[in-house]
């Protein structure tokens, strides 16, 4: 039960951070005043795709973020598979463009995997470990 509560609190903190970014930090929605239902339905400008979810399925992105954000200084560790410890930790990106949309990455073909690995500068075998290839 405590793990479920911790997960919900982490997600709520991420959502609140996104709201503060929209209104006060980046200020692209300074007058936003949404109800709880509107927030739940994501009726705000921008999106917050999270690493490991359908629109950003490559869990290895966490290794890049770990270097950029200095995870150890935040008390966050990564497993060899890119999962975060403590479990109730979330990473993602914030996108402010008014027309951005969530989307799911479908089945990834071998040609796409090879091209993606080449663009990332890593081997296809390494990337395959972090993607659901089904």
What are these model-predicted stretches?
Residues 1-100, 111, 130:
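Small-residue-enriched alpha-helical segments and adjacent helix-cap loops
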Residues 106-134:
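TerminUS-proximal long segments
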Residues 101-105:
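A short, ordered amphipathic alpha-helix with a cationic face
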């Amino acid at each position: 039960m405590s793990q479920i509560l911790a997960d919900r609190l982490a997600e709520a903190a991420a959502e609140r951070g996104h709201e503060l970014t929209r209104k006060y930090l980046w200020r692209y929605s300074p007058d936003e005043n949404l109800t709880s239902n509107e927030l739940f339905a994501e009726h705000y400008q921008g999106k917050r795709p999270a690493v490991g979810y359908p629109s950003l399925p490559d869990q290895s992105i966490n290794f890049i973020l770990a270097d950029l954000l200095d995870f150890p200084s935040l008390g966050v560790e990564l497993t060899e598979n890119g999962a975060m410890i403590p479990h109730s930790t979330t990473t993602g990106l914030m996108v402010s463009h008014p027309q951005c949309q969530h989307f799911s990455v479908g089945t990834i073909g071998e040609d796409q995997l090879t091209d993606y690995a080449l663009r990332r500068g890593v081997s296809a075998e390494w990337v395959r470990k972090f993607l659901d290839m089904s």
